[in-house]
C-alpha cells in the first residue's frame, strides 16, 4: 500500500512541474475578469471515431483477471510547498538498474524481466530507475511498467518488429487494478526513440491499429523527451483515468497515410471504458485531470492532441496545452471535447487541417457507466476555457475519408442531440446531419450549449474559416488577427457566430475571405445581448459585418469596416439594436443597412465612399432613431429610409454625396431637425416619395 508521506512528496514534485505553467483556471478567470471590465453586462460516426486499436489481444468484454505473457499485445490532496532541493534529494534516493543488452538485440524479455525486478524493489520512499543504454534495439511484444519506476532510454532507439497489432508499453501485467486514479502511481518515461514501425505489421488495411503507450488508472505520470515514430491507425500515447501528468519535450512523427479515418490523435485523453480504452479494469469511467502537455513537436501526423470520446456529465478537467509545435497535420491540431478549466496557449500550428476544436458534447461517442442517472440537465456547465496567443496556418480544403474537409482556425461549438425538432448537430469531419440515437448510449436528447470560452490574441491565416462559434453562450472573442485567402470554393468567414447568446466580439483584425467578415446570427431563444465592438474588417466578399436575430439590445459599436464586396454593416431582425460610432467606407453596397429592426438606434457613425447609400433603414425598421451621423461622398444618397414609420432623423451631416442628401420612401418621419447639408447632388436636396415628415 502506498505510504502517504512519500506519495505526498512525489505529488509535490509533479505539482512543481505542473506549476511551470500557471493553473488553467487562473488564466481563464483572469481573462473573464478582463472582459468583464471592458463590457458591462446588459441584460464522427461511432465506428469511425471508436478506438481502432486491437484490444491488447484480449477481449475487451472479458472482466476476469488476465496475466499477460511477454509477447502479449497488450488522489485527491492539497498542494503543498515544494523546493528544488526536495526534488533533487528524492531523485538521489533512486535505485538504478541497467539493462544488460547488446546493440541490435530484441529487448522485450530482458527489459520486462528488469521492470519486474524494479517493481519488486521500488517503494514509495525509493523509486527504481531502469536504464536502457544507448543503442539500437528491437521489440517483439508489449512492455509492462509498474508503480514507482523511472524508465530512462535517452540515446536508445527501440523499433517494433512484431507483425502483430499490439501495444508497445502499458502499465501492469494484469487488466485489473484498484481503479479510479489508484491503480498505479509515480511513473516516468524519459527519452528514447520508440518506432511503432507500421511497415512490419501484417494486414495493415484490416480492422484496427495499435496504440504506442497506453497508460490508465494512474496518478503522477511523466512522459518526457521521447520521440514517437510511425503510428498505425491509432494513438502514439493514450491516457485514461490519469491524474497529475506532464508530457513535455516529446516529438511525434509519421503515420500510415493510406488510412484517413478515425481520430488518430498523437496524444489521446480518454476514459476507462471497454470500447474506447480496453484492457484497464475496472471500467469505471475515470477521466483525465490535471494534465500538462507542453513543448512538444508534432509533424507529418494525422491529428495532434485531444479527445474524441467522453463520459457524459464527467468532464476532463484542468488541461493545459501550451507551447507545442504542429507541422503538416492532415486534420486538427487540438480537440477539446467536454473539457473544463483548460488553457490552450502559445502553440504554433503550421499547415494544419484545423487549429483548435472545442466542443461541449459528442453524443456519437459519449458514454455512461452502468447505473449512472442521466438527464438533459446533465453536462451543462461553463467550460471555462482560454484559447490564447496561438499561431495557426491552415491548409487548403481537402477530402478526408471520402468527405469534404473545410479547415478552420478555431471552432467552438455545442450540440443538439436527436429529439430537438428542427435542430442538427454541428459536426466537424462527418455528415452535418449526423445525430445520435439516445437509446443506444443513454445520452438524453437536448441542447448542450458551449459556455465560458475565450479566444484571445490568436493569429490565423490560410484557406479556412477563422473563428467559429456554434450554439454558444457567454463566450468572448477578442484581439485576434485573421488573414484569410479568398481563393476558396466555399464561403469562408473571419468570425462567425451561429445561434449565439452573449457573445462578445471585440478588437479583432480581419481581412480577406469569400464570405462575411463577422457573421453573428442568433435565434428567438437568444436571451442575452451580443456585442460586436472595436473590430477592423476589410476585403471580404460579402458583408463586412452581418448581425441577425440576436437578442434585443445587441450592439454593433466602434468598428472600422471597409472594402467589402457587399454592405459594410448589415443588421437584420434585432429590435432595440444599437449601431453606434462605426466607420464604414469604400464598401460596394451600403455603409450601414438595417432591415426589420424595431426601435433601433443608429448614432454617431461615419460612412463614406460607399457604392450605394451611406445609411439605409428599410422593411419595417419602425420607431428607430438616426442621429449624429456623418454621411459623405457616397455614390448615391447619404441616408435612405424606406418602408418604415416613426423614424427620427436628427443632427446628421450630409456632405458631397452624389445622389440626394437623404431619401424618404413610403415612410413616416416623426422628427427631422438639426441636419446639415453641403455639396450633395441634386442641388443639395432631400427626396420624399409617398412619405410624411412631421417636423422639419
Task: Locate predicted features.
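Right-handed parallel beta-helix/beta-solenoid
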Residues: 70-113
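Sec-dependent signal peptide cleavage junction
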Residues: 20-35
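Short glycine/acidic-rich loop motifs that flank beta-strands on beta-rich extracellular proteins
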Residues: 138-142, 160-166, 198-204, 211, ...
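N-terminal extracellular ligand-recognition/capping segment immediately after the signal peptide
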Residues: 105-112, 125-166, 173, 194, ...
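Parallel beta-helix/beta-solenoid
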Residues: 146-148, 153, 184, 189, ...
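Short, T/G/N/S-enriched strand-turn elements that build extracellular solenoid repeat scaffolds
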Residues: 111-122, 138-147, 178-179, 236, ...
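Right-handed parallel beta-helix
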Residues: 181-328, 333
Amino acid at each position: 500500500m502506498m505510504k502517504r508521506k512519500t506519495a505526498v512528496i512525489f505529488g509535490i514534485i509533479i505539482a512543481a512541474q505542473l506549476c511551470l505553467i500557471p493553473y488553467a483556471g487562473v488564466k481563464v478567470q483572469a481573462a473573464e475578469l478582463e472582459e468583464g471590465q471592458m463590457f458591462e453586462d446588459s441584460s464522427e460516426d461511432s465506428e469511425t471515431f471508436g478506438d481502432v486499436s486491437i484490444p491488447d489481444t484480449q477481449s475487451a468484454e472479458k472482466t476476469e483477471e488476465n496475466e499477460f505473457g511477454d509477447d502479449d499485445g497488450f488522489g485527491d490532496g492539497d498542494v503543498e510547498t515544494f523546493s528544488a532541493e526536495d526534488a533533487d534529494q528524492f531523485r538521489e534516493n533512486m535505485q538504478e538498474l541497467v539493462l544488460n543488452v547488446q546493440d541490435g538485440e530484441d529487448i522485450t524479455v530482458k527489459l520486462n524481466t528488469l521492470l519486474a525486478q524494479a517493481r519488486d524493489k521500488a517503494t514509495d520512499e525509493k523509486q527504481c530507475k531502469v536504464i536502457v543504454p544507448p543503442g539500437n534495439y528491437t521489440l517483439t511484444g508489449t512492455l509492462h511498467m509498474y508503480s514507482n519506476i523511472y524508465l530512462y532510454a535517452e540515446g536508445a532507439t527501440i523499433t517494433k518488429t512484431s507483425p502483430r497489432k499490439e501495444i508497445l508499453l502499458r502499465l501492469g501485467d494484469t487488466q485489473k487494478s484498484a481503479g479510479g486514479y489508484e491503480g498505479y502511481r509515480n511513473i516516468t518515461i524519459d527519452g528514447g526513440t520508440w518506432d511503432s514501425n507500421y511497415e512490419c505489421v501484417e494486414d495493415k488495411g484490416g480492422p484496427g491499429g495499435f496504440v504506442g503507450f497506453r497508460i490508465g488508472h494512474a496518478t503522477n505520470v511523466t512522459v518526457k523527451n521521447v520521440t514517437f515514430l510511425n503510428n498505425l491507425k491509432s494513438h502514439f500515447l493514450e491516457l485514461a483515468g490519469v491524474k497529475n501528468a506532464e508530457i513535455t519535450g516529446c516529438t511525434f512523427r509519421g503515420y500510415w497515410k493510406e488510412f484517413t479515418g478515425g481520430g488518430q490523435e498523437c496524444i489521446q485523453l480518454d476514459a476507462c471504458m471497454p470500447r474506447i480504452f480496453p484492457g484497464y479494469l475496472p471500467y469505471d469511467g475515470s477521466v483525465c485531470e490535471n494534465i500538462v502537455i507542453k513543448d512538444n513537436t508534432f509533424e507529418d501526423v494525422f491529428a495532434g492532441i485531444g479527445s474524441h470520446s467522453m463520459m457524459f456529465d464527467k468532464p476532463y478537467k484542468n488541461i493545459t496545452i501550451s507551447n507545442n509545435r504542429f507541422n503538416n497535420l492532415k486534420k486538427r491540431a487540438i480537440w477539446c471535447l467536454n473539457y473544463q478549466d483548460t488553457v490552450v496557449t502559445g502553440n504554433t500550428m503550421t499547415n494544419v487541417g484545423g487549429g483548435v476544436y472545442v466542443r461541449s458534447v459528442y453524443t456519437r461517442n459519449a458514454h455512461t457507466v452502468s447505473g449512472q442517472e442521466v438527464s438533459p440537465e446533465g453536462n451543462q456547465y461553463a467550460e471555462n476555457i482560454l484559447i490564447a496567443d496561438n499561431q495557426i496556418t491552415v491548409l487548403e480544403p481537402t477530402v478526408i475519408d471520402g468527405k469534404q474537409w473545410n479547415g478552420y482556425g478555431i471552432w467552438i461549438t455545442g450540440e443538439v442531440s436527436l429529439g430537438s425538432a428542427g435542430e442538427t448537430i454541428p459536426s466537424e469531419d462527418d455528415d452535418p446531419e449526423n445525430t445520435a440515437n439516445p437509446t443506444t448510449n443513454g445520452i438524453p436528447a437536448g441542447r448542450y450549449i458551449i459556455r465560458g470560452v475565450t479566444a484571445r490574441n490568436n493569429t490565423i491565416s490560410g484557406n479556412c474559416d477563422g473563428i467559429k462559434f456554434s450554439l454558444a453562450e457567454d463566450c468572448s472573442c477578442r484581439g485576434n488577427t485573421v488573414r484569410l485567402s479568398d481563393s476558396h470554393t466555399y464561403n469562408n468567414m473571419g468570425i462567425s457566430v451561429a445561434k449565439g447568446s452573449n457573445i462578445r466580439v471585440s478588437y479583432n483584425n480581419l481581412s480577406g475571405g469569400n464570405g462575411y467578415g463577422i457573421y453573428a446570427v442568433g435565434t428567438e431563444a437568444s436571451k442575452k445581448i451580443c456585442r460586436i465592438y472595436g473590430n477592423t474588417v476589410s476585403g471580404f466578399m460579402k458583408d463586412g459585418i452581418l448581425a441577425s436575430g440576436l437578442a434585443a439590445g445587441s450592439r454593433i459599436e466602434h468598428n472600422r469596416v471597409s472594402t467589402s464586396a457587399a454592405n459594410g454593416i448589415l443588421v437584420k431582425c434585432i429590435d432595440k439594436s444599437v449601431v453606434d460610432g462605426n466607420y464604414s467606407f469604400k464598401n460596394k453596397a451600403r455603409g450601414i443597412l438595417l432591415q426589420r429592426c424595431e426601435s433601433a438606434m443608429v448614432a454617431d457613425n461615419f460612412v463614406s465612399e460607399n457604392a450605394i447609400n451611406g445609411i439605409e433603414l428599410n422593411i419595417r425598421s419602425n420607431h428607430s432613431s438616426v442621429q449624429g451621423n456623418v454621411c459623405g461622398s457616397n455614390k448615391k444618397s447619404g441616408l435612405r429610409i424606406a418602408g418604415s414609420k416613426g423614424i427620427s432623423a436628427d443632427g446628421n451631416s450630409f456632405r458631397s454625396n452624389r445622389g440626394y442628401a437623404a431619401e424618404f420612401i413610403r415612410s413616416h418621419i416623426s422628427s427631422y431637425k438639426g441636419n446639415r447639408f453641403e455639396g450633395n447632388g441634386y442641388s443639395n436636396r432631400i427626396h420624399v416619395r409617398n412619405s410624411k415628415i412631421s417636423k422639419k
